[in-house]
Amino acid sequence: MAGLSHPSVFGRATHAVVRAPPESLCRHALRRSQGEEVDFARAERQHQLYVGVLGSKLGLQVVQLPADESLPDCVFVEDVAVVCEETALITRPGAPSRRKEVDMMKEALEKLQLNIVEMKDENATLDGGDVLFTGREFFVGLSKRTNQRGAEILADTFKDYAVSTVPVADSLHLKSFCSMAGPNLIAIGSSESAQKALKIMQQMSDHRYDKLTVPDDMAANCIYLNIPSKGHVLLHRTPEEYPESAKVYEKLKDHLLIPVSNSEMEKVDGLLTCCSVFINKKTDS
């Protein structure tokens, strides 16, 4: 089944939904390994700059949801909704402690008048961080947070697009080591597991994608947007955080490159795509 999205439309967005980080993020957010403690003041500052890029710099209408101290991971809004065109799938996150995060997101997306589909099957789990939409098709990572039933419900929700599953063993999510860096361009990390996942995606797809290989898996998570007044825009990790990967992004001469710091969220496994959900609302003409 061929996807219907046209490359000139891929990456278009009018709105972004974000959520402020709670202080409980520092001690109680889920993390794969215990490492450095999160500097909350710095995390807040980095998040505010991130939101500022989306709103002030790129002109998106930013819907800012408030922090909830009882939901330490609530800043990572990507995991609780998958939006494609006019439809929003409200997910069932793999971690039980995150299930209540969906309520406020559902309310926000209803206000934006999207068609809401809720994942109510108690056997299904899906984190948005495991969902890579290429503009032509979906790849869904099967991880500790996302299962086959979750992928099936996503396929039922977005019937116009092919959906393929990719095993994710060594990372939290599929997008912990890849993302879209352009209409036909997959950014991918250099680790063995990242390269193995890419090979599976290439085998599953009828389409041939270009690839942008970066040395650091975490830095392969970037945000591509197609902003009419700006052209191709790419938010990527800073040279201070990932110098070698930043050099690779700097070779993209037809993109407006915006380095964004994310050191604090990364301590609790949060990457750039994790902190926003993008919506492209059609204007009434």
Swiss-Prot record:
Q: Does the keyword S-adenosyl-L-methionine apply?
A: no
Positions carrying N-acetylalanine = 2
Q: What does this protein do?
A: Hydrolyzes N(G),N(G)-dimethyl-L-arginine (ADMA) and N(G)-monomethyl-L-arginine (MMA) which act as inhibitors of NOS. Has therefore a role in the regulation of nitric oxide generation.
Which protein are we looking at? N(G),N(G)-dimethylarginine dimethylaminohydrolase 1
Which parts of the sequence carry Phosphoserine?
33
What protein family is recorded? Answer: Belongs to the DDAH family.
What pairs make up the disulfide bonds? none
EC assignment: the record states 3.5.3.18
Q: Which Pfam families does the protein's record reference? A: DDAH_eukar
Alphabetic keyword roster: Acetylation, Hydrolase, Metal-binding, Phosphoprotein, S-nitrosylation, Zinc
Q: Where does Zn(2+) bind?
A: 274
BP-aspect Gene Ontology terms:
arginine catabolic process; arginine metabolic process; citrulline metabolic process; negative regulation of cell population proliferation; negative regulation of cellular response to hypoxia; negative regulation of vascular permeability; positive regulation of angiogenesis; positive regulation of nitric oxide biosynthetic process
Q: What class of enzyme is it?
A: hydrolase
Q: Which organism is it from?
A: Rattus norvegicus
Output the superkingdom of the source species: Eukaryota
Which InterPro entries does UniProt cross-reference here? Answer: DDAH-like (IPR033199)
